[in-house]
């Protein structure tokens, strides 16, 4: 079964017609309408695998699926909008679900659909990783964004031109030359 979002009756009819033309029972396409967010997340329990789209990846929808425990399969696109799911999967420790071509995507989708232990293994890893990897670590995200804001403010206060910098895993700023600079010196807080 393929579960899709119900948004456009014309698209729904076209997809059902295309399925029938390819010898697939159109009733195997299930279209689900909008629900309140909590109910929407709850219905994820009946899904086995989230198949991402190209050229525009799922963004919040993929994040919701991962939070609900559904492995997401994606194909890395060429532009930002086609690389979001790859970033999400990397941040939750499941980069093996990021494919580099549509042929690879199709092959892995078929393997996951027919190899229950393989799919179960990804589900179990996702369950373990969800609270241990950066994707859903709100405290870490806050430390990093605060470090970035502090650095931008410091640069502006010194009347320097805006410049590139990164934020290290423990909330330290990485200057372009690679030397970490301690954060929150004005606030006196521990960036760790």
Positions of PLM-derived features:
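Hydrophobic targeting segments
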Residues: 1-3
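C-terminal amphipathic helix plus adjacent low-complexity
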Residues: 5-7, 12-21, 30, 35, ...
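Flexible loop/turn segments at secondary-structure boundaries
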Residues: 8-12, 38-40, 58-61, 80-82
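Hydrophobic (often cysteine-bearing) scaffold residues that line and stabilize catalytic clefts
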Residues: 11, 43, 47, 81, ...
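Structural motif
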Residues: 21-24, 42, 89
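Catalytic binding pocket for nucleotide-activated donors in carbohydrate/polymer assembly enzymes
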Residues: 26, 53-138
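Conserved active-site histidine-acidic residue motif and adjacent donor-binding/catalytic loop
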Residues: 29-42, 57
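Acidic donor-binding loop of glycosyltransferase active sites
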Residues: 45-55
């Amino acid at each position: 079964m393929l579960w899709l979002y119900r948004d456009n009756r014309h698209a729904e009819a076209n997809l059902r017609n295309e399925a029938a033309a390819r010898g697939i029972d159109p009733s195997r396409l299930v279209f689900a309408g909008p629900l309140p967010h909590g109910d929407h997340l709850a219905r994820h329990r009946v899904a086995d695998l989230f198949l991402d789209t190209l050229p525009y990846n799922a963004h919040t929808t993929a994040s919701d699926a991962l939070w609900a425990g559904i492995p997401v399969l994606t194909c890395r696109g060429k532009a930002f909008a086609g690389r979001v799911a790859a970033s999400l999967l990397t941040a939750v420790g499941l980069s093996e679900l990021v494919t580099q071509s549509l042929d690879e995507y199709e092959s892995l989708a078929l393997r996951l659909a027919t190899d229950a232990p393989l799919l179960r293994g990804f589900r179990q890893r996702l369950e373990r990783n969800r609270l241990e990897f950066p994707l859903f670590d709100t405290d870490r995200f806050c430390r990093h964004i605060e470090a970035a804001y502090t650095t931008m403010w410091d640069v502006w206060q010194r009347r320097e031109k805006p410049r590139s910098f990164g934020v290290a895993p423990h909330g330290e700023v990485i200057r372009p030359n690679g030397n970490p600079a301690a954060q929150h010196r004005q606030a006196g807080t521990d960036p760790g």
